[in-house]
């Protein structure tokens, strides 16, 4: 009852129904509204609301569902009322093994402008073309790296710290951050920024990617830090699978990366991590996935259950968290349609599946930040990767705009 009238408007009633079941259709909601509004005044009073529990409908409410609903209501009070979307560009590529990811953010943004898919803040309050740009250190590539098992960690730490501050400030200003990332290493900064803005909230992460990205300098076979963001964010070293010995300088910088925005501890718990489409992993990562029983909704799950059901399973796994961060690495898609990325992998999801997956996730009011990364125009053919990514980006912006109750211009 947002306006304190003592009754639920049709919109308030609809929001409640969607909290219980994010996959319910508009027609199903309309039918339930017709049943509930007994006197036809366009509002649902207390007696009418209680009576809805006796109706035959597709909506089943359990005690567990009510507990989850209580947590969702708290999130509506705390973080769901964003005033608009803020676009943040972090075009860093030092964490990757190839070059070109730094061009991905600009390519996606340019494609959006050309297709008039970007929203203009001045006209409708949804998405500003004047994006926030995090200063990067890509110039350091020309000088080479000093840290064998955490390449460019000295420069990346600076980028991660800046990303932390920008994301935190954006959230504190009541804006929904949509992050356009270069390589995936900077996701550690995004996560730290969320935690900095909401230090007392329990954070969950949905990691949509072909790779687990949970190596540490102790376990990495390559030293590329785009494979380490989750180990940074969860303060995980995985010493049981150690193959590398670190020098004191690398170790000191690594500990700083693990404490981004914190005095101590981790930015989120590894138990509050969910994978989607992860399929190209290594032994050290498999050990962590098995040890911590990290849920991985595979491409096969997406095909057999449907992307919307998979999204719902992810949300159910994270029912105990207060906030959710969703990050989408384009290599989660099948290599036949995403060669424009540094580490493509076969047996991935397709564009329509990615759209539905992200759209369903974003209906949950606990989702407070979304990120897309690893687009590499230098490896692309006929701009396929950028165009596919643009379709997903448009879907996401529309989904967020619907939550903000605004109608964006396209």
Where are the language model's segments positioned?
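Short aromatic/basic micro-patch
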Residues: 7, 43, 267
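Eukaryote-specific detector of the first structured module of a protein
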Residues: 1-5, 10-15, 46
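EF-hand and EF-hand-like Ca2+-sensor regions
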Residues: 19-23, 34-76
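Conserved alpha-helical scaffold segments that buttress catalytic/binding sites
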Residues: 76, 80-410
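Conserved tryptophan-centered aromatic signature that marks the ligand-binding surface of SH3
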Residues: 4-7, 31, 40
